[in-house]
Regions:
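Catalytic beta-strand/loop module used to bind and position nucleotide/cofactor moieties
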Residues: 1-172
Length: 172
């Protein structure tokens, strides 16, 4: 059975940049657990086993906020308070970077190098799924400063760029 925690973060970032928050949270949780990240923001072991699922919803109520839900299997015995702490600290540091202009290119610009270092699956074969249906097959070749994944389709002549809200990747 899954357990988890939910936290509300209020990063001082433009509304268009809040999409970066779940990536930053996943990166922080992965560091805390000695894990890796699978696109877009799933925390996994080095072998790809799921550790923590990160989901986020943004809104505006007396300022921008992001509600982040972290979910894991009960038998993992993770410390919710520790995960909340590292998530909050990472988002605060990221918001400071955004405020100083380090995210002018996009919300992930300040952390993209660290995200790539933690990312598991670059170059691996994937299926791109939309609505549960395969719409493309190829290899994950990039993630941009907006968090979009680029998949080089079979044959290598075309690339498909997808955002997390458009499609998901299944590693094959």
């Amino acid at each position: 059975m899954g357990v988890g925690t939910s936290l509300v973060l209020r990063p001082s970032v433009p509304m268009g940049h809040v999409t970066g928050a779940p990536y930053v949270v996943a990166l922080a949780v992965a560091r805390e657990l000695g894990g890796r990240v699978r696109w877009p923001h799933e925390v996994v072991t080095a072998s790809g086993e799921s550790l923590v699922s990160v989901d986020a919803r943004a809104g505006y109520d007396e300022g921008v906020f992001v509600r982040c839900d972290l979910v894991w299997e009960d038998e993992k015995g993770l410390d919710a308070a520790a995960l909340e702490r590292v998530a909050g600290e990472a988002v605060d540091a990221w918001a400071d970077d955004v405020a100083t202009g380090r995210a002018a290119a996009g919300p992930l610009a300040p952390v993209l190098s660290d995200y790539f270092d933690a990312l598991l699956g670059m170059g691996e074969k994937v299926e791109v799924l939309r609505g549960g249906r395969v719409i493309g097959e190829g290899a994950l070749v990039a993630v941009d400063v907006w968090g979009r994944a680029t998949v080089r389709l079979k044959g290598g002549a075309q690339e498909l760029e997808v955002a997390p809200e458009q499609a998901r990747l299944r590693y094959v």
